[in-house]
Regions:
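An amphipathic alpha-helix signature
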Residues: 12, 55, 83, 87, ...
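Hydrophobic/aromatic-rich alpha-helical bundle segments in the mid-to-C-terminal region
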Residues: 121, 125, 140-192
Length: 201
């Protein structure tokens, strides 16, 4: 990575950290520059404003496809064993959410939902829509092949993913990751309960 690209990425990473702690309104360009280790004027060599930094962070997470990050050919091959598939997908999803930047972003997203700032990073509903779309397709596939009970895939999608997001919000919106085992236990318990309600007896 060229020096300029590395500095630009460092500005984004530092800004995400500061925004997630102080909010958009509580973070200044001066503070960002100080943490990056450059003059305040140096920020403007890469971004026109704090708002542009904020929007670029949001766009990065909007465009980061969770599905393409998590779903592999090996995982898709497990669809014929729905319980195993759901468990393994959940493990990969929690691991993805456990990265430092994912933790910071969900905290920032929650902080900015009801802020008085004119800049809105995105709504929780917008953030969850990609996961919903992916799960609609997965449950539609499982239903069509009679691997689970015949239930509206959109309903199944919401019923499956919403508790996982609640677990994420409760346990994974802090910087530390010391509760990962507890998070996984709760997630697996949800998968077991959910699968019991959709499996074909």
């Amino acid at each position: 990575m060229a020096k300029g690209e590395a500095t630009r990425q460092l500005i984004l990473d530092i800004s995400l950290d500061l925004f997630s702690k102080n909010g958009f309104a509580g973070t200044s360009v001066r503070h960002i520059a100080r943490e990056v280790g450059i003059r305040e004027s140096g920020i403007y060599n890469y971004f026109t404003s704090k708002t542009e930094i904020f929007k670029e962070i949001a766009n990065k997470f909007k465009s980061t496809a969770v599905g393409s990050t998590i779903i592999s050919d090996d995982l898709v091959e497990q669809l014929e064993e729905p319980h195993q598939f759901l468990n393994n997908f959940t493990n990969k999803l929690i691991s993805h959410w456990n990265s430092q930047n994912e933790r910071r972003f969900i905290r920032l997203l929650l902080m900015e939902q009801y802020s008085q700032s004119s800049e809105k990073i995105m709504t929780l509903n917008e953030y969850m829509n990609e996961a919903r779309s992916m799960w609609w397709m997965i449950f539609d596939e499982l239903t069509r092949h009679k691997l689970i009970k015949e239930v509206d895939p959109k309903l199944l999608s919401d019923e499956f993913i919403a508790p996982l997001y609640m677990i994420r919000i409760e346990y994974m919106a802090a910087d530390e990751d010391g509760k990962l085992d507890e998070v996984l236990d709760k997630a697996y318990n949800h998968v077991d309960f959910f699968y019991d309600s959709i499996k074909i007896d």
